[in-house]
Amino acid sequence: MSGHSGHDVKYGRHRTRRSFARISEVLELPNLIEIQTASYQWFLDEGLREMFRDISPIEDFAGNLSLEFIDYDLGEPKYSVEESKNRDANYAAPLRVKLRLINKETGEVKDQEVFMGDFPLMTEMGTFIINGAERVIVSQLVRSPGVYFNGKLDKNGKKGFGSTVIPNRGAWLEYETDAKDVVHVRIDRTRKLPVTVLLRALGFGSDQEIIDLIGDNDYLRNTLEKDNTDNAEKALLEIYERLRPGEPPTVDNARSLLVSRFFDPKRYDLASVGRYKINKKLHLKNRLFNQTLAETLVDPETGEIIASKGDILDRRNLDQIIPNLENGVGFRTLRPTDGVMEDSVLVQSIKIYAPNDEEKEINIIGNAYIEENVKHITPSDIISSISYFFNLLHGVGDTDDIDHLGNRRLRSVGELLQNQFRIGLSRMERVVRERMSIQDMTTITPQQLINIRPVVASIKEFFGSSQLSQFMDQTNPLGELTHKRRLSALGPGGLTRERAGYEVRDVHYSHYGRMCPIETPEGPNIGLINSLSSFAKVNKFGFIETPYRRVDPETNRVTDKIDYLTADEEDNYVVAQANSKLDEQGTFTEEEVMARFRSENLAVEKERIDYMDVSPKQVVSVATACIPFLENDDSNRALMGANMQRQAVPLMHPEAPFVGTGMEHVSAKDSGAAVTAKHDGIVEHVEAREIWVRRVSLVDGKEVTGGIDKYTLRKFVRSNQGTCYNQRPNVAEGDRVVKGEILGNGPSMDSGELALGRNVLVAFMTWDGYNYEDAIIMSERLVKDDVYTSIHIEEFESEARDTKLGPEEMTRDIPNVGEDALRDLDERGIIRVGAEVKDNDLLVGKVTPKGVTELTAEERLLHAIFGEKAREVRDTSLRVPHGGGGIVLDVKIFTREAGDELPPGVNQLVRVYIVQKRKIHEGDKMAGRHGNKGVISRILPEEDMPFMPDGTPVDIMLNPLGVPSRMNIGQVLELHLGMAARALGIHVATPVFDGANEEDVWSTVEEAGMARDAKTILYDGRSGEAFDNRISVGVMYMIKLAHMVDDKLHARSTGPYSLVTQQPLGGKAQFGGQRFGEMEVWALEAYGAAYTLQEILTIKSDDVVGRVKTYEAIVKGESVPEPGVPESFKVLIKELQSLGMDVKMLSADEEEIEMRDMDDDDFTNQNDAFNIVQPENAAAEKTE
């Protein structure tokens, strides 16, 4: 290594960065959108099959016909991804299912293939295309099914317990203690019963049986006293009365009700994850840990003693007897009588001494390891969960923390789709059953039985309107990637914003390496929407796992063997940090190592370490890992930094940061915005729109050339957010490429790296107060050289429909429009590509037939002379809205004749794309990567900017007061290191938690020949004098955010009014006015500005007659007339009259003012020079 700290690392083909990382990466980052693609693949391979298996066979009520699902296959999609986007269609493939109908009376079998609707496919990028728009299905964090125990204090401060058995779907079972030490059960949220009633109903009728089963104790005695039933049948009737109040109870009904509630797999489903969690929780291994045996354990087969009475079961003893436990030690077969189920129940029961009372023996009952494929609850589950509850009262067992990630799981795309599909199938099943009983059994075919409507509808509903199916954030590649890795606790079956408390939202120790503690939205969703950590994976049960390096217990060496652990597995181990020092062999060099165990950070002897972190950045998400010097920023500001990077607008000339973290390449590659090579090969041909790669493969050590892969690049397409999506080649002809390499840069990418902004020269200084309150002062050079210029594409559409009075027509023959306005329209009335348009220009000329009114003689004469045209149409052309001017980029025309699919009633659809080049502007919002955001307040000429001793003017001035109180010092370190990197002509990588430290920064500054304090003298550009103090000047990476002033600027003279109050609407989207509210009125009253106040409350707002006359007067240049009565005052009077009050208006000389009646409204509105009256909800339609 040369004289500097750090070493060179290559990122992709074109970029080398000097990395300051000290920890070598043991594990490559996984594919970052695997959470989407793997889950959907599971659904196609297994999820669908599982569902058809669950529902099959469907039998009719008599049991004569049975319909079975044999197999399914997905055909080829109707349109390609690109075509689906252009045609506003779904990217979907037809699902065909093979059905078999068996007539049991005749033994006849009919096989048939049935089409079951088009099924949306996932693109390679992990998105779906629904109605032409890219959407993402966000994974949902929900409480895992299983059994949970929690401690609670009642109002007298007495400690009690509660417990819940939560299924995936089905009835809940809850246990709780009350103030009198009685244990109650609630079945499906009904009123509570003593828990012994449930045990009797399961077939343990007498008090003695229950005491023998659970073990004698005070709680049980109290509960038996409270219980008024004394046998199984009475207990069953008691439960039936609770569940079905008001129906006459019979024992048989009660039995079948309980069976259907709990033991019927169709009505009660734990899912495999629920069965796994229940078996794990009720397993005797964890419950016997550190307890003292109260009986001698004997192997039932050999008769040998495994453990004797009085033994303490520590980890070693326990590990020895676990195999015996699972082979039947302590198994008891219970024979219930008269209960719900006739079958005998197998449980496992072992006696120990209670830890809080050495004399007392207690029974620990397990569920005897039920098979994984039993998805419903069983009597032995119920008995062992009741046993666990009683054990808790004696101090055996643990309560659960529901915010622990071992108890929360992810439902990803595949499972969400499966649940939705299941709803559709079960609706279909009902229809099939009905049809089976109605139709002729001899002639019926599967096709006639099946109605695919409910299935298609449920899928459509899920993709179109579910809370978890979201319009993809495509502002830039990072936003796209983060959206696919988002985890939401909201949505159907999840939490709601209002109900979620602080605990759920808080950072939990089990989030380590699984969910990012930093990246979450500010506002009402904070902590409910999270991001997956960079190395995390999701296992088959939906729990998030994170990788750790295993420590060999014999040698205490850290190996390169990687284990993925879920949160509850990790709870058993001590984990060392990634930056613990190791020698060459992988042994810890220090005797005491900083490590984590559950929620504690401890210094531990090195022999006790079980695992070690894989990488320092495994804690944080991808967006957070893109912030250099994250370790020097306050967490609140880091949160803003991570969130604002996702809002960066793609620039015309993007530039990768001088100071990066090494994540830029990976995140760009996996985001789906770049073009990546599908196979190894040699680039044969490169042009702006296409790259050809000749495949090369190794066969028996020889290179063999194969076919050509053609990659199309997307040029100047509109993204979901209206930014410009443009791909540029990143390779040259003759280059050798490997699979997965970036061939073409997407938006916001530079040489295969994420490039959200630009490196600019920043000085921390004030300048005439223009950067007060985080405002930013900028040099005009950034405007002139298009440094922060971005391209925006907006889409406008116009459709010609059939109306009652005849079809609308697209034409350039528009009433009352001069030839000048039509100069850029072609003969069909559609704008030409390349035309420059301004606000209110015509894009598509369109006329709509008007209702025919009776004509006067004069009008008839005019018609006779000038022909029909003048009469029956009005102008409904598409015009450029305010702030939408630009250059016409593209025009797409869809017509019925050309065979395009259009909505019913639409004959022709025209889409016009207008592109704008937006330079940076005062009022635009900019930010760094450390949460340092601000609005541009002034753009100064270059010659007025402060300049450095060599004459270079700075680009941006930031307020130094923005740093100390916000505690984001990372920006200052980035500033100095960036300056040094630019001077040395290198790019650097400083990974999070393992990047450049202070010495590294200063040594790089020195190497670059800068001053020791990295500050410089600046001269005032206006006077040429030096400023008093030395100033920190350096290179910072600044991004332009999607909050641009062009989208917010808005002005109105006249426009639409609300229907009832006749006041202007609000908001830019409705072309509304500025509200002059109650407080503003007080301000004018305080000034005594009577006339100003009068016109604001009348002619500028809702004095209908007055505003028309005022408008006329201004146009004609006359004086403004007297204001009339505001409409809202009339509304008030009408409201009072509706209460039965007689209210009159009097003028100053006590004459009654006649209120203009509602019939006159039409008259004024027709004469209104700017007609537009809108109901208030019309606003919503316009914003669509």
Curated annotation (Swiss-Prot):
GO terms for cellular component: DNA-directed RNA polymerase complex. It comes from Listeria monocytogenes serovar 1/2a (strain ATCC BAA-679 / EGD-e). Gene3D superfamilies: 2.40.50.100, 2.40.50.150, 3.90.1100.10, DNA-directed RNA polymerase, beta subunit, external 1 domain, DNA-directed RNA polymerase, subunit 2, domain 6, RNA polymerase alpha subunit dimerisation domain, RNA polymerase Rpb2, domain 2. Residues 1160-1184 are annotated as: Disordered. The keyword Transmembrane helix does not apply. Pfam families: RNA_pol_Rpb2_1, RNA_pol_Rpb2_2, RNA_pol_Rpb2_3, RNA_pol_Rpb2_45, RNA_pol_Rpb2_6, RNA_pol_Rpb2_7. One of its GO terms (biological process) is response to antibiotic. GO terms for molecular function: DNA binding; DNA-directed RNA polymerase activity; ribonucleoside binding. The gene is rpoB. This is DNA-directed RNA polymerase subunit beta. Belongs to the RNA polymerase beta chain family.
